[in-house]
């Protein structure tokens, strides 16, 4: 309300720990309850806030997450009669959680939804604190609410852009660039180009295992020795590798059930890079 001068009302229809199946447009009890609330209150809604998915981090549901979320979005819009915006959040973490691959699939699906479904936005949450093994602290929820308000203000009211950085290109750093930015060590560096970087990346640790990135090729995992960022080249990150990587590989970022606690973030928004899983790269 402070940003627009207009009061903001929320219609609460969520339930903690609910899987996507309960939002199934055909017979999901939570979906039907949401429709009841919509019809009871009437009026036109500005958007849907969506933070869900932990209960779908199992084999089967994880693989179908994007498909089922798309069905939910399309059914909701059909019911309302207009393309209501969706403001979504990638999953945070579960301390000592299992099914790493499934967490990676769901986070990746949440990123793809924002890319593939018109009117869907996404925020990253992997640097927010927890009060137990899986739930955000009260402070983290306040911070998340402020981030959502900024993104809603951008989408709905044309305010300043507020999006997490997003990886758009991976290539080998050439000799001139390695020399210019003093990328020494093994001499094997990847250059990552990102969109939506306000100023530059804040990298809390230069150690590769703390970077949040995982790289694999046909020979297995490629150890990441170090990560670098710099102000002169604000929308880039550099990864130093322990060995040469094949021309075709897969890169993942903050994908496990309990990934790194302090991934690289935008220095202005403090939003981590958008998580992704097994992104195919050709060098």
Report residues per predicted region:
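Cell-envelope and extracellular/periplasmic
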Residues: 1-283
């Amino acid at each position: 309300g402070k940003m627009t001068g207009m009061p903001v009302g929320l219609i609460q229809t969520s339930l903690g720990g609910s899987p996507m199946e309960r939002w199934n447009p055909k017979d999901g009890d939570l979906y039907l309850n949401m429709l009841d609330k919509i019809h009871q209150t009437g009026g036109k809604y500005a958007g849907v806030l969506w933070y869900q998915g932990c209960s779908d981090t199992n084999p089967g549901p994880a693989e179908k997450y994007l498909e089922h979320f798309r069905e939910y979005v399309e059914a909701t819009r059909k019911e309302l009669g207009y393309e209501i915006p969706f403001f979504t959040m990638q999953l945070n973490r579960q301390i000592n959680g299992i099914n790493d691959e499934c967490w990676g699939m769901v986070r990746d699906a949440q990123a793809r939804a924002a890319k593939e479904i018109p009117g869907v936005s996404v925020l990253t949450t992997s640097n927010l604190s927890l009060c137990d093994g899986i739930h955000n602290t009260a402070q983290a929820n306040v911070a998340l609410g402020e981030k959502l308000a900024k993104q809603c203000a951008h989408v709905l009211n044309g305010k300043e852009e507020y999006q997490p950085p997003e990886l758009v290109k991976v290539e080998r750093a050439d000799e001139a660039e390695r020399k210019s930015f003093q990328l020494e060590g093994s001499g094997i560096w990847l250059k990552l180009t990102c969109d939506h970087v306000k100023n530059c990346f804040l990298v809390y640790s230069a150690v590769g295992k703390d970077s949040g990135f995982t790289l694999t090729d046909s020979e297995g995992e490629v150890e990441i020795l170090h990560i670098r960022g710099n102000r002169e080249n604000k929308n880039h990150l550099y990864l130093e590798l322990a060995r040469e990587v094949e021309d075709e590989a897969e890169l993942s970022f903050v994908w496990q059930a309990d990934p790194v606690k302090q991934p690289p973030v935008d220095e202005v928004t403090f939003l981590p890079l958008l998580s992704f899983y097994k992104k195919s790269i050709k060098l």
